[in-house]
Amino acid sequence: MAKNGLVIYILVITLLLDQTSCHASKFKARKHSKRRVKEKDGDLKTQVEKLWREVNALKEMQALQTVCLRGTKFHKKCYLAAEGLKHFHEANEDCISKGGTLVVPRSADEINALRDYGKRSLPGVNDFWLGINDMVAEGKFVDINGLAISFLNWDQAQPNGGKRENCALFSQSAQGKWSDEACHSSKRYICEFTIPQ
């Protein structure tokens, strides 16, 4: 009987060990399956994020094409004349809300392109805002992003406003020369949009 009890005991232990190893392998399989699901979930999230970036880039391109169709294109920029009069900060905020900035000419060719576009799109307008100012340091004119301006096209005796006139204007009557003006003056303006590569 003791022998039978030992055999039964060994059988029970064997069955328990078999069940335990079966549960352990099922647990490992579930754990591995969960890891694969998490990996796939991460891959899907990455793909969705990539698709959103592509969709947003396409939306930006479409918006830029609309701007270029309504305005004019010059090299890697589009210009769009805005409606109404605004002071410098309002004009810049309006351009930013459209995805651009106030125009900043960086060459004589760009001055000529702006003169031509300004005559066509802003008939009768003598001057308009540029995205150039010296609000931070008197006499040190920078663009909207705070970068120093390397190309300058000031009219004779300009800038002359000292601390009262810190924002730059493009003058049609002075053949595209610049002058400084009080930033709170209301003027017309042109927004520029950079065309991505």
Swiss-Prot record:
Origin superkingdom: Eukaryota
Keyword Zinc (UniProt): no
Classification via Gene3D superfamilies: Mannose-Binding Protein A, subunit A
A single BP term in Gene Ontology: ossification
InterPro entries: C-type_lectin-like, C-type_lectin-like/link_sf, C-type_lectin_CS, CLec_Tetranectin-domain, CTDL_fold
Primary localization class, coarse: secreted
CDD domains: CLECT_tetranectin_like
Cellular component, GO annotation: extracellular space
Keyword vocabulary terms for this entry: Disulfide bond, Lectin, Secreted, Signal
Start and end residues of each C-type lectin domain: 74-192
One Pfam family recorded for the sequence: Lectin_C
A molecular-function term among this protein's GO annotations: carbohydrate binding
Subcellular location, record wording: Secreted
Its biological purpose: Promotes cell adhesion to laminin and fibronectin.
PANTHER family: C-TYPE LECTIN DOMAIN FAMILY 3 MEMBER A, TETRANECTIN-RELATED
Protein name as it appears in the record: C-type lectin domain family 3 member A
